[in-house]
Amino acid sequence: MQPVLQLMSRVGPSDANVLITGEHGTGKEVVAQTLHALSNRASRPMVTVNVGGLAEGVFESEMFGHVKGAFTDAKTDRVGRFDLADGGTLFLDEIANVPLNQQAKLLRVLETGELERVGSSKTHRADVRILSATNANLNEEVAAGRFRGDLLFRLNTIEIHLPALRDRREDIPALAAHFLSVHARRYRKHLTGFDSAALQLLLQHPWPGNVRELDHAVERGALMAQKNAVGAADLGLAASRDGSIQSGRLEDMSMEEVESFLIRKALTRHGNNVSQAANALGLSRSALYRRMQRYGI
């Protein structure tokens, strides 16, 4: 992670737009928060928008705002996310999910800094730095006609790629120790670390949910531990190294653990493509996002 940290330290103080890439749970929002904190805009707001979680048809109103009477449900004026972030940073998570028919409008705002609220012809300016994140390959999205190449160029002044946790296992002990310290303090427990079996399990687990899943597992371990050291059973990691449910464990799992496992399997099977995983699970994208947040995936 040292090259990533060095790049963040160089890019953070600038006003450059940054595209943060990596699988779900690799810490993209943490990187965005750090870049904002390093910038000259740190005293101003950082506004986060989960583009993938926006209901269909509301992107323009959410981002640019609207005036009363602009459409049937517009009972009052609404301030958009660009205006809320004025002078600060706007973080667009899951940027690949911006509707294609709205991408030209977003591009224009990024190029000019000018926007109009829905239902208004009055143009005004918003001074924002754009940080965006995605787990998708945007070059492939451009080639497939689902994402505008000119918008990608505007967003991607600098790209910061976060490797999957399974590709940097040497970071697991330090990350786990950090999360344990945080959760031990939160739950007012005296915990000295992990026993050897727990540490071995942490090092061998496939971590399809990456750092977020590790944090979730360590939090559970902190809650469940009855000794000073967290044990393997406390972590609630029901999957083996190859990601399959261990023999004899299914009947011991709660409904929440089974659902969490199935979501992780679907994401792994579909290359962390949320739309495809949601379709395979019979869920809407927004429903899957809610479950992923619930289970720390």
Where are these regions (language model features)?
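Conserved RecA-like P-loop NTPase ATPase core
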Residues: 4, 26, 49, 63, ...
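Bacterial C-terminal helix-turn-helix
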Residues: 20, 27, 33, 249-297
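AAA+/SF3 P-loop NTPase mechanochemical coupling elements
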Residues: 47, 74-87, 91, 99-105, ...
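Conserved post-Walker A coupling segment in P-loop NTPases
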Residues: 6-73, 83-99, 164-169, 190, ...
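Base-recognition residues in the alpha-helical recognition helix of bacterial helix-turn-helix
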Residues: 104, 108, 116, 153, ...
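Nucleotide-binding/hydrolysis machinery
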Residues: 2, 13, 39-44, 119-129, ...
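The short alpha-helix immediately C-terminal to the Walker A/P-loop
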Residues: 29-34, 61, 94, 105, ...
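N-terminal pre-P-loop "Q-motif" helix
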Residues: 1-7, 255
